[in-house]
Structures are given as C-alpha cells and as structure tokens.
C-alpha cells in the first residue's frame, strides 16, 4: 500500500511540473510575439545618410504629417511593397487590386498615424530623384536631404492612363517617364519654410486638341493647345469630331493639334510605322530630335487617311440591323451595310456584334431565325471586293482578298459567348434546312467544330425543334456530309462527257495536276449541265444511272441520245433528275445562265426574255411604220398616178391611166398561176409582212380601211391611197419610180434564179400545194401566222434598193395563190384575213423570225411544267404558236446558228479517268462570280456550285495559303 501511495505522489508531481513548463513556454511565446508586433525603432541608426522616419518627422514637427500626405506617400508604392508594409503593421492583407488598393492604403495610413511609424524598406535613396522618377513601372519619391522638410508624394494630374491618349496610345513606361517627380517635401512644406525654396510656375502638361482636317490646317488657323485640362475638354466638346492628348512639351502638343505624325500607314505599305510616341520617348531630353521621321519642314506629312465611316450606335445595330435580319428585309439590310460598311465589319476586321451578352453577329441571328436569304446575301456582300474597298480604299487586291477570307471565316465559324455555338450549330439545332444548305456549301465552313458541351453540328440536329420530320433531319445530315455535283461536259465538237464527282471541299491541286497533264491536242471541255447538290452516295449512284440508264427505258433514252446529238444527253439527265427529285440545271445560250426551265425561276427568266423580245419587235415595227408614213408624206406632193391597194394593171402599163376596173381585175387574176411557187417567200421578210384582205374597189379603198396598220407597225406606200382614190407615184419625194414593167421583170428573173437554189429545200407539187414543205401544219392551224422567209430570200431583199424591195413586196401581195387568203371580195374570207393580219405580228420564236431547234428543245424542257396563262402570258403565246406545228415538222426545224464558241464557265475538273481535256480560261464565262446577285433564288446554282468552280477553287487555294 505504501509503495502504491509513493507512485501516485510522484506521478502527480511530474504532472504539475509539466503543466508549469507548458504555461511558461506559452508565456514566453506570447511575449516574443508581442515584441515582434511592436514597431521597430527607426531612430537607432544615427547616421545622416539614412532617411529619417515619419515618427521623427512627427516628433520634430508635430501636426504636419496629415492623412492626405500619408495617403499620397502610400500611392507611390507598388503592390508588393504595400503588401509588406501592411503585414508589418500587423494588419490582415488580401489581394491588392485596383479596387481594393485604396482600402488597404487607408487602413495602413491610419495604423501608421496611430503608431507614429512610417515606411522603412520602401523608401528610395535621395539620389533616385535625379536618376529616374519611376522604378519598375511605379513612382518612388525619396525624401529630401534637408531634414527640416517634410515628405509628401508627387503625382501627375492625369493619373488615369488611356483617358486622353488619342488613337495611338503610348506605352505605359513612356507615359510614366513623361511625368517629372517633385520631392515629397515640396508638397508638404509648412508656411514657415515656403520662402526658402519656390516651385516653378510653368505647367508640366500641355493638351493639344486636334480637329478633323480635310486637307490640313489653314495657315492662319488657330492651333488649339491648352495648359488646363478643363479648357482642353471644353474645346474638344465645341469642335465636332476632335480629340485631345496630353504632351510633355508644347512643341509636341502643337504638332498633334496640326495633325502631324498621327496616322499609321496601311498594312500594304512597306514604310516603317510612324508613331510620335513609339518613335521617341517623351521623357527624353532630346525630344523629337532623335528621330526625324516625325519632323517636316513644311509641317505636312504624306499620311493615309482612314475611311470616313463612323461606328454605328448600339441602338442602330439592335433596332435597325438586327431587326432587318430577323424579318428578312433584304433591301433595308443592303441599304444599311452599303451606306456604312461598319455595320458588318468592326474594329480589327471583326464581325460586328448585334446582340450584347450572347455576342451574336448577323450570321448567328440569321441562322437562328431561319433567314437563309440573309445568310447568302451577307456572304455575297462580304466576298465582294468593292464592299471591302469601302473600308480600305488604298489596299491592293491581294490585301483585300486576305481581309475578305479573314472576315468571312470569322462570320462562319465564330462561336457565341453562351454555348460556344457557331451559326451552323444554330441552323442544325433549330432544324433550318435552307440555312444549313447555304452554310455547309461554303468552302471556309468548319463542320466538326464542337460547342461548350462537346457536340458537333451533326449531333445537335433538331434539338430545339423536336417536331421536325425524319426526312428533314436526313436532308440536314446529307448537307453536312458534303455538296457533290455530277457535271456534264461538252467539247467544241459537242461530244458529251459525264465528268467525275465535283465538290466544293475538293482541293485545287488535283485539278491543277490534271490540267498540266492534258495534251494540247485534247478538245476544250465546257460545263453544260450538272445535277446537285447531292450526298456522296446519291451523286455516285446518279452518275452511274446517267451513264447507264435503267433497262426499262434504255431504248427510249438511247434513241434520244442518237437523234439529238446537241442536247440529247441533257434530256436524259433532266428526266432522270426530275424523276428522282434531284436539283437539275443546264446552260441556255439565249438566257446566258444555268437554270432549270421547268422551275419557277426558269419560267420567270423565260417570261422576261419573251416579253423583252416582243417589245423589241414592236419597237422595230413602229420605226418602220414611222419611216413609211414619213416617206408617204414626202411623196404625196409629187404623186400623179393612180394605184390600187393590190398591184393593179396600171402598174404594168407605162402611163395608161384610163384602164377600166374590169380590165385590171382580169389581168390581175392571170398573175397567181404564173408565180405561185415563189409567193409565200415574200409573206414575211425583214421589213415585215403586208396587210392582206383589202377590198379591190377603188371607191371603198382609203387610208381608213387599215384598222390594224398602226398596231402591226407597217405603213407601206404601195398599200396607201389618197382620199381621192389615187395612189402614190414615188417612194422618195424627189425621184419617180422606174418603169414598173422593167422593175418587175428584173424581180421575176431574180426570183427564178433564187427558186433554183431553193429547190433542195422545198419542191412544190403540180397543184401548187406548199403545206408539207413551206407551210407545215397549215391544215390544223387555220388562224396561225405565215411562215417566215428563208435566210436566202431575206439576204436577197437586203441587197436590193428600197424601191425594188417595195415593188417585190407588192408583187408578192399581188401573186398570192388560190389557197392564200388575199381576195376577200372573191373568196369571201375577209374576217379570216383580218385575224391573220393581226396574228402576223404576234409571231414569236426564240431565235430569229422563224422556228428553230431551240424552240423544240425549250418545248421539251417545259413538257412537265404547268404554265399558267395568267402568270406567264408570253410563254403561253409562244407555246401555242409552236404547238401549231406537227411533231414531224418540229423534227425538221434547223438548229440556230451558234454565236461563237461555247461561253460557259469552264471548270477545272479532275476528269483524267473519264475524259481527257483541258479547261479554257474563265474570262469568257457567262456566269462569273461577280455577276451573282442576291436576288437569285436559293434553288438556283449558287456561288459554290460547278457554275462558279473557278472562283470556288481560288477561294479555297487562298484560304489554304493563308493557313500555312
């Protein structure tokens, strides 16, 4: 028991000893911390070289160190030194930023004033005042050597960097070096010591105000240089468009106010950059003497002026531009961007933001609102060099192309700020298939870019529109797979070749290599038609189907290709494409473009062409009518002989005016049997057809018997009679006609010779029937117009003088056959003749005055089209005229004369496996990229189809070079 008690006592004593030792250790540690927290004694260094402390200054001159002076002193410290002083003062220190710095400065100043201490390690030596005002980007002002002076901080009036530095802001170090420091004691001197040292009165900063000069300042114009910042601000407000800037010397401010050395050269210039700030440091003692680039004896400089377009306001971008894009207002959109290109191109050639927060540009908004036409119009405008030249008028074409590629790439592939979605993401997400078609066809589009959630455009198809059909989703996927075309090429000898698949994603090297390997003897291949855009699999299947038609229609397609070597394979491809529902276009020379005539756009173009042709024909007829009427008036004064409406027998007699009417009729009836085979050749000539069906009675014949004369556009002197029943003697006003008998004899001889040359084309039978050779389908078209004259007869009429031509026309009118409706009195066909006269001016064909194979080809292209007479009246009239002829007659129509070579866009296709050929330059292209207008429909061949392949490859080639 005793042993146990001793053990307990020992353990208790040991525990008390340990507890006492712990308490002692804690007390010592507390005392050490208290000693560390006490401010250091700054008076222990008695040497004169060490800077005096703030406590000594306070003790020597109590009440002179104020809170403002302490705050000014602390502003000269950099963030690291300020953090050290805060820690030494025993205060908690967080991150020091531009917003929190003032809080820590104020706390530290209060603590130092309470403790009577000041900064120690951060104070610079007195020699630093004359050496440099700023060290490591921050101002450190040493105290004065004079111990009787108090220490204060000196800081510039313009502490906010970048407030008034103009267009070319200087470097931060340059601005820092431009401020001359003042000793800290100079600002905190007592009134008792102000008499000792006086500060200079000269201002430290000069403010130059630069107005907007058109051709430089006038010689006697005032130069705006101010010493007060408020005055400079007031002047800048009064002078519209001006800007001001702070300078160290008055000379620099005057140069700035005159507009000298203020503009930077264009990126295409090779001259060095001229900047008054970067060329010479403003704090240097040499001023601008070190670099003479900014000095000009005449104070003028060869500078490049920027464009005069101002940045649009945010309200205009939102209320005008974005609203026009959302509503699809193309005209308003075009007016805005062409009036100020900065609506599309912002600073740094970046897309203009039309919706802040999400940072949407025009392409984002158009893709989101399903405005495919606005996307296409935006791309076409940005790729127009003339539009970019508005922004950079001094750039050459190479620089403009680089800028265009840069801006277009940003518009197509810039993600938004919220979900990192590109315009293609928006189009796929909302199921806007037309927008996907436009965007995915561009060569600069990136189709596999991922958004914030790591999804590509293909993975977000119809995420925001779940009610879309599966067929539409499949179409979007096909567009994202690529746009492929099946082209049809033709050589100069019209031999067709179905080329390899063509896509906008193909590289240009392959086509260039094939171009170099082609032989000079190979024919030049031209693009005539193409199918697409299609997916790669569909394009390959259609190419095989086009080359080898299905067995059921193989015979029919084979007969078409053999019977029509000029456009047979186009007909086969057209029918296959329409049957499968694939886009199809072919080139038509008379329209000058690639188009599908059965589409709405094709019908509209054909309607415009026919209307223009009708107007042109009517204008020519009016000109002839005016000429004839003028000649009638001039010849009316010298007329002395009588002529009937038709050529009477008086025309065959030399001056016998007393012939009776019955003799005239008898001799007139003997003429048709002699010249029947050649009469119809004169029905329609280059000068027009004659009005038929006039009465023979001279008493009833007058000018008023031609109700349709003005409408038809003909006013022939031989068909006119004066009011007294007499005809006109001469066509000129001065010379009379030669003897009519001799003239008609010469004409008959010429016609006999001409009929021998025309015997190969037409052979009339004994009865004089010309329905099968000259007038096709006359049996089923009683009210159709007369067939146009052959080219040989037309050329013959051109070579004759006007008098002979008029007599020939009169003879043709006289010598109409029995089946030709000429004598209304005898045959009783006056109503029919009037309609024939009216319809003769409505004859309308696509090429010339007579039907040709072109009419047959266009009719075949419109076979499946539903033509509404109300919407397309001209097409309806043309089709009715062509359908009056039988199919066998239409097969015999000749091909129109080709006007030169094929002028289509010659595309460099890699057709070395299927054909050998080289492509001619694109200078003779009928569908140049520059001619593409925004009004073209989305279903017409776009800028990136084979119709514009050369432009396409050029863009891809330049983009590839830019990427390198």
Curated annotation (Swiss-Prot):
Residues 71-115 form the LEM domain. The keyword Protease does not apply. Residues 923-937 have a biased composition (Low complexity). Residues 1-7 are extracellular. Residues 666-726, 920-949 are annotated as: Disordered. Residues 29-964 are cytoplasmic. It is found in: Endoplasmic reticulum membrane. InterPro entries: ANKLE2_3rd, Ankyrin_rpt, Ankyrin_rpt-contain_sf, LEM/LEM-like_dom_sf, LEM_ANKL2, LEM_dom. ANK repeats lie at residues 419-448. Gene3D superfamilies: 1.10.720.40, Ankyrin repeat-containing domain. Pfam families: Ank (PF00023), ANKLE2_3rd (PF24567), LEM (PF03020). The modification Phosphoserine is found at residues 266, 275, 503, 519, 535, 675, 916, 940. It comes from the Eukaryota. Residues 666-688 have a biased composition (Polar residues). One of its GO terms (biological process) is negative regulation of phosphorylation. GO terms for cellular component: endoplasmic reticulum membrane. Keywords: ANK repeat, Cell cycle, Cell division, Endoplasmic reticulum, Membrane, Mitosis, Phosphoprotein, Signal-anchor, Transmembrane, Transmembrane helix. Interacts with BAF/BANF1. Interacts with protein phosphatase 2A (PP2A) components PPP2C (PPP2CA or PPP2CB) and PPP2R1A. Involved in mitotic nuclear envelope reassembly by promoting dephosphorylation of BAF/BANF1 during mitotic exit. Coordinates the control of BAF/BANF1 dephosphorylation by inhibiting VRK1 kinase and promoting dephosphorylation of BAF/BANF1 by protein phosphatase 2A (PP2A), thereby facilitating nuclear envelope assembly. May regulate nuclear localization of VRK1 in non-dividing cells. It is unclear whether it acts as a real PP2A regulatory subunit or whether it is involved in recruitment of the PP2A complex. Involved in brain development. Belongs to the ANKLE2 family. This is Ankyrin repeat and LEM domain-containing protein 2. The gene is Ankle2.
């Amino acid at each position: 028991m005793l042993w146990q008690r001793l053990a307990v006592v020992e353990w208790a004593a040991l525990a008390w000893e340990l507890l006492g030792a712990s308490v002692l250790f804690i007390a010592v540690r507390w005392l050490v911390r208290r000693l560390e927290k006490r401010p250091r004694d700054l008076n222990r260094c008695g040497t004169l070289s060490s800077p005096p402390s703030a406590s000594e200054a306070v003790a020597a001159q109590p009440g002179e160190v104020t809170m403002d002076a302490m705050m000014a002193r602390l502003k000269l410290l950099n963030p690291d030194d300020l953090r050290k002083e805060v820690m030494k003062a025993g205060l908690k220190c967080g991150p020091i930023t531009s917003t929190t710095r003032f809080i820590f400065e104020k706390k530290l100043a209060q603590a130092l004033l309470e403790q009577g201490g000041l900064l120690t390690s951060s104070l610079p030596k007195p020699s630093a005042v004359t050496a440099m005002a700023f060290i490591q980007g921050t101002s450190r002002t040493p105290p004065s050597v004079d111990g009787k002076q108090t220490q204060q901080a000196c800081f510039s009036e313009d502490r906010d960097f970048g407030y008034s530095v103009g267009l070319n802001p200087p470097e931060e170090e340059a601005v820092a070096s431009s401020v001359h420091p003042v000793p800290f004691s100079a600002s905190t001197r007592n009134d008792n010591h102000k008499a000792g040292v006086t500060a200079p009165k000269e201002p430290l900063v000069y403010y130059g105000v630069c107005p907007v000069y058109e051709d430089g300042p006038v010689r006697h114009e005032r130069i705006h240089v101010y010493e007060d910042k408020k005055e400079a601000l007031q002047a800048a407000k009064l002078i519209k468009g001006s800007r001001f800037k702070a300078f160290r010397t008055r000379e620099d401010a005057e140069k700035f106010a005159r507009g000298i050395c203020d503009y930077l050269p264009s990126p295409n210039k090779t001259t060095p950059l001229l900047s008054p700030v970067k060329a010479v440091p403003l704090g240097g003692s040499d001023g601008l003497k070190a670099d003479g680039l900014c000095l000009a004896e005449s104070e003028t400089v060869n500078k490049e002026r920027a464009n005069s377009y101002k940045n649009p306001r945010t309200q205009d971008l939102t209320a005008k531009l974005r609203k026009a894009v959302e509503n699809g207002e193309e005209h308003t959109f075009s007016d805005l961007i062409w009036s100020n290109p900065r609506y599309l191109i912002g600073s740094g050639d970046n897309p203009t933001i039309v919706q802040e927060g999400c940072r949407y540009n025009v392409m984002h908004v158009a893709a989101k609102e399903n405005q495919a036409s606005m996307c296409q119009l935006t791309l076409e405008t940005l790729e127009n060099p003339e539009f970019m030249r508005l922004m950079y008028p001094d750039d050459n074409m190479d620089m403009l192309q680089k800028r265009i590629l840069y801006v277009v790439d940003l518009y197509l592939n810039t993600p938004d700020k919220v979900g990192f979605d590109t315009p293609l993401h928006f189009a796929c997400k909302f199921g806007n298939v037309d927008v996907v078609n436009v965007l995915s066809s561009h060569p600069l589009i990136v189709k596999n870019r991922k958004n914030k959630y790591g999804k590509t455009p293909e993975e977000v198809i119809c995420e925001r529109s779940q009610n879309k059909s599966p067929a539409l989703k499949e179409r979007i996927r096909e567009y994202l797979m690529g746009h492929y075309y099946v082209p049809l090429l033709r050589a100069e000898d019209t031999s067709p070749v179905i080329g390899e698949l063509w896509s906008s994603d193909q590289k240009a090297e392959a086509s260039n290599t094939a171009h170099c390997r082609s032989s000079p003897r190979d024919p030049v291949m031209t693009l005539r038609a193409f199918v697409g855009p299609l997916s790669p699999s569909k394009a390959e299947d259609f190419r095989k189907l086009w080359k080898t038609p299905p067995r059921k229609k193989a015979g029919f397609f084979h007969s078409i290709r053999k019977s029509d070597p000029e456009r047979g394979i186009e007909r086969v491809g057209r029918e296959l494409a329409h049957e499968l529902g694939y886009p199809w276009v072919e080139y038509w020379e008379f329209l000058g473009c690639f188009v599908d005539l059965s589409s709405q756009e094709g019908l509209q173009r054909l309607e415009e062409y026919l209307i223009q042709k009708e107007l042109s024909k009517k204008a020519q007829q009016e000109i002839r009518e005016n000429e004839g009427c003028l000649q009638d008036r001039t010849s009316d004064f010298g007329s002395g002989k009588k002529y009937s409406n038709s050529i009477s027998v008086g025309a065959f007699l030399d001056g016998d005016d007393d012939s009776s009417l019955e003799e005239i009729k008898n001799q007139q009836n003997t003429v048709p049997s002699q010249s029947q085979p050649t009469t119809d050749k004169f029905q329609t000539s280059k000068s027009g057809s004659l009005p038929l069906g006039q009465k023979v009675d001279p008493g009833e014949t007058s000018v008023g018997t031609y109700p349709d004369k003005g409408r038809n556009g003909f006013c022939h002197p031989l068909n006119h009679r004066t009011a007294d029943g007499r005809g006109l003697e001469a066509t000129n006003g001065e010379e009379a006609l030669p003897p009519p008998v001799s003239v008609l004899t010469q004409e008959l001889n010429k016609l006999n010779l001409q009929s021998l040359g025309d015997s190969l084309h037409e052979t009339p039978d004994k009865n004089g029937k010309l329905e099968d050779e000259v007038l096709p389908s006359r049996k089923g078209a009683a009210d159709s117009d007369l067939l146009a004259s052959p080219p040989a007869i037309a050329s013959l009429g051109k070579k004759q003088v006007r008098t002979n031509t008029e007599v020939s026309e009169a003879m043709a009118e006289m010598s109409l056959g029995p089946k030709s409706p000429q004598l209304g009195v005898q045959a009783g066909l006056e109503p029919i003749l009037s309609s024939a006269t009216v319809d003769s001016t409505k004859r309308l064909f696509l090429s010339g005055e007579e039907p040709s194979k072109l009419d047959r080809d266009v009719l075949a292209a419109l076979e499946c089209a539903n033509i509404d007479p109300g919407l397309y009246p001209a097409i309806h009239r043309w089709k009715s005229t062509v359908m009056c002829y039988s199919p066998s007659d239409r097969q015999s129509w000749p091909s129109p004369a080709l006007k030169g070579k094929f002028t289509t866009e010659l595309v460099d296709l890699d057709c070395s496996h299927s054909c050998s050929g080289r492509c001619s330059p694109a200078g003779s292209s009928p569908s140049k990229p520059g001619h593409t207008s925004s009004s073209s429909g989305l279903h017409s061949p776009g800028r990136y189809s084979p119709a514009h392949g050369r432009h396409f490859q050029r863009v891809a080639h330049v983009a590839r070079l830019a990427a390198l």
